[in-house]
């Protein structure tokens, strides 16, 4: 019997609260940092309940059907191997969105929600009746779709090089009438938009090649091309700096997500390329998370 089966050996827990405790313990034994949260999300996924509804049901002493408990056992065993929760449920929350995700696409992170807010603010402040926003390397489409849905007067364009990731982005953005998605290279995409964009934003690959992320969910499951940005992690950012200058109108804003230790190097890079008003911004954990600059 594998560790993944331990919580369900013998008689299944009869109550939802007992099953929640057993699942959380199984995930804690597997080394997960938030086992209770993951257990609640897995059980909620099986039962079709939100976390609040699930917690209320556990307090009431609700019981769970055997078939649902067995389905949960299989999903919890997968999570105990460090398969991403989002791959198991097939979805990832992002701001007001629920995105479809799975193998072949980078899972959107909560910290990116703050980064896209800067782009949304710039679009909302634009004097243009239909400002143009461009997402370079859109992955799942999270950033592009957030801009398109929260600033409906904007015209949003997104490019993704990976066919696998592009397929996920196409699924997520299919109903966004003000969003254009293309499969292609961010270095050459959208030539027809030169000099028109109010905002160019990217969450590019920025992990240095020698710094393999420690979390199995990241280094085993996130696409390699979405993680690594060359020896210093800045190879793709260098390309974006040059391309964004061509796409933005004078005074247009570039928004770049990056690792917490890269702000100074990126500001120096952007300054050398002729950008102005470069600034690095912290996320909610007080770590440097994004750098902005204005086109000359």
PLM feature segments, named:
Residues 36, 43-121:
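Conserved AdoMet
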Residues 1-25, 124-132, 174-178, 192-194, ...:
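Short, low-complexity, intrinsically disordered N-terminal peptides in bacterial proteins
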Residues 129-137, 157:
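Conserved class I S-adenosyl-L-methionine
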Residues 119-128, 246:
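Glycine-rich helix-loop-beta junction characteristic of Rossmann-like nucleotide cofactor-binding loops
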Residues 140, 150-296:
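S-adenosylmethionine
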Residues 1-55, 59-62:
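Non-catalytic accessory regions of SAM-dependent methyltransferases
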């Amino acid at each position: 019997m594998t560790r993944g089966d331990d919580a369900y050996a013998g008689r299944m827990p009869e109550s939802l609260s007992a099953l929640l405790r057993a699942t959380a313990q199984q995930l804690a034994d597997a080394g997960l940092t938030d086992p209770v949260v993951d257990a609640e999300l897995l059980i909620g996924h099986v039962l079709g309940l939100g976390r609040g509804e699930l917690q209320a049901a556990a307090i009431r002493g609700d019981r769970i059907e055997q078939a649902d408990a067995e389905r949960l056992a299989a999903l919890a065993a997968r999570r105990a191997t460090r398969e991403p929760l989002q791959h198991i449920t097939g979805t990832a929350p992002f701001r007001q969105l629920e995105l479809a995700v799975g193998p072949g696409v980078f899972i959107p992170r909560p910290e990116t929600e703050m980064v896209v807010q800067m782009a949304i603010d710039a679009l909302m402040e634009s004097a243009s009746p239909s400002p143009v926003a461009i997402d370079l390397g859109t992955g799942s489409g999270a950033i592009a779709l957030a801009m398109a849905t929260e600033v409906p007067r904007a015209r949003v364009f997104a490019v993704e090089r990976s066919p696998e990731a592009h397929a996920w982005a196409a699924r997520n953005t299919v109903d966004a009438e003000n969003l254009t998605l293309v499969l292609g290279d961010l270095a050459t995409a959208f030539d027809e938009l030169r000099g028109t964009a109010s905002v160019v934003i990217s969450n590019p690959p920025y992990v240095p090649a020698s710094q393999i992320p420690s979390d199995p969910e990241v280094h085993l499951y996130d696409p390699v091309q979405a993680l690594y940005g060359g020896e210093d992690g800045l190879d793709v950012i260098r390309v974006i700096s040059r391309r964004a200058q061509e796409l933005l109108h004078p005074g247009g804003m570039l928004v770049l997500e990056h690792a917490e230790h890269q702000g100074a190097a990126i500001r120096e890079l952007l300054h050398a390329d002729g950008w102005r008003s470069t600034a690095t911004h912290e996320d909610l954990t007080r770590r440097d998370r994004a750098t902005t600059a204005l086109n000359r």
